[in-house]
UniProtKB/Swiss-Prot annotation:
It is found in: Cytoplasm. GO terms for cellular component: cytosol. One of its GO terms (molecular function) is RNA binding. Keywords: Cytoplasm, RNA-binding. The keyword RNA-binding applies. NCBIfam families: PRK05422.1, smpB. Required for rescue of stalled ribosomes mediated by trans-translation. Binds to transfer-messenger RNA (tmRNA), required for stable association of tmRNA with ribosomes. tmRNA and SmpB together mimic tRNA shape, replacing the anticodon stem-loop with SmpB. tmRNA is encoded by the ssrA gene; the 2 termini fold to resemble tRNA(Ala) and it encodes a 'tag peptide', a short internal open reading frame. During trans-translation Ala-aminoacylated tmRNA acts like a tRNA, entering the A-site of stalled ribosomes, displacing the stalled mRNA. This is SsrA-binding protein. The keyword Transmembrane does not apply. GO terms for biological process: trans-translation. Its main location: cytoplasm.
């Protein structure tokens, strides 16, 4: 089979900095027509968004989709709550994760797959300040090592 084409529209890079990502799920999302047009134009922000399980359904909060310029009366509230579409067994697994202390649901990517808008939902555990510092130190050390090898390879 041919590889499915995925066009990434938005990424939540802050999530990788603030959380340990345990597992990811692909979820559909319920949107209006003007929201889809706005997303296709890339006018979406995942930075402070999160998901919750309520009444055995998953909802996404604080995802900002800018109003479509030509949408006038059909535009919805940019920060409205949006329902995510997942299978029942996936929702049950998410409920199991979220009931444990310290775990939360964070959207990490928003992308188009076969013309449909999908959200990559991650089960995440918050990092402490020392974990963040450790990651930064590790990243800097790796960067220095790569720089050293590159200089050595070029003969500088």
């Amino acid at each position: 089979m041919a590889k499915e084409e995925i066009k990434i529209i938005a990424q939540n890079k802050k999530a990788y900095h603030d959380y340990f990502i345990e597992e990811t799920y692909e979820a559909g999302i319920v949107l209006s027509g003007t929201e889809v047009k706005s997303i296709r134009m890339g006018k979406v922000n995942l930075k402070d968004s999160f998901a919750r399980v309520e009444n055995n359904e998953v909802y996404l909060y604080n995802m900002h989709i800018s109003p479509y310029e030509k949408g006038n009366i059909f535009n919805k509230d940019p920060l409205r709550t949006r329902k995510l579409l997942l299978n029942r067994h996936e929702i049950n697994k998410l409920i199991g994760y979220v009931t444990r202390k310290g775990y939360t649901l964070i959207p990490t990517k928003l992308y188009l797959k076969r013309g449909l808008v999908k959200v990559e939902l991650a089960v995440a555990r918050g990092k402490k300040l020392y974990d963040k510092r450790e990651d930064i130190a590790r990243r800097d050390a790796k960067r220095e090592l790569e720089k050293h090898f590159k200089e050595k390879q070029l003969g500088i």
